[in-house]
Amino acid sequence: VNQHVGGVVLRSDNNNFVGPENALPELQQLISDLQKTRYDTSSAANYLRTYNPLLIGISQTENLLPTDQILNGITALPSEMTIGATWNTGYAEEAGSILGEELNALGINLFFGPSLDVLDSIQTDAGEKLGVTTFGGDPYWVGKMGQAYIKGLHEGGQYKVAVVPSHFPGIGNSDRLPEQEIATVR
């Protein structure tokens, strides 16, 4: 409280979600408690209530480990590669809209995604997971699909969900997930 925390990132490996059967109600309660604490402490020393809500962030892309945090209770969405393979920005926007609506309903207001990596080569070894977390290998179409997905997130989330696309240029061609080890890009 005294550290003036501006936000939190919720992750299943931090035990922010316990058990599949109660994950969503527990998550909503956790977020509500965090925001209430923020509200109560924002005005404790002031006569005027100046409340800025906490940023509650999460990574949630396609209901698969290790990139997703909430694995039960929300709509199962296709991977970015599946969406990208359609060459239809309408599908990307629709998937983003569904996710934005569900994140907003839970109280999550910061989304880490989608991946805007450009996959330069097919990987069949340890790095293959990167292949489904990108819209494809053409920079133009990855940009178009990402733009539509983000538009859907904003509209579905009633413009209450901020979006931070990931990762860095070239990481779509790395040999391992950056969350596991330092990736090598060749």
Show which residues each predicted segment covers:
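Anion (oxyanion) recognition and catalysis
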Residues: N104, H154-G157
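Enzymes and membrane/adaptor proteins characterized by extended Gly/Ser/Thr/Asp/Glu-rich
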Residues: N2-V142, H167-V185
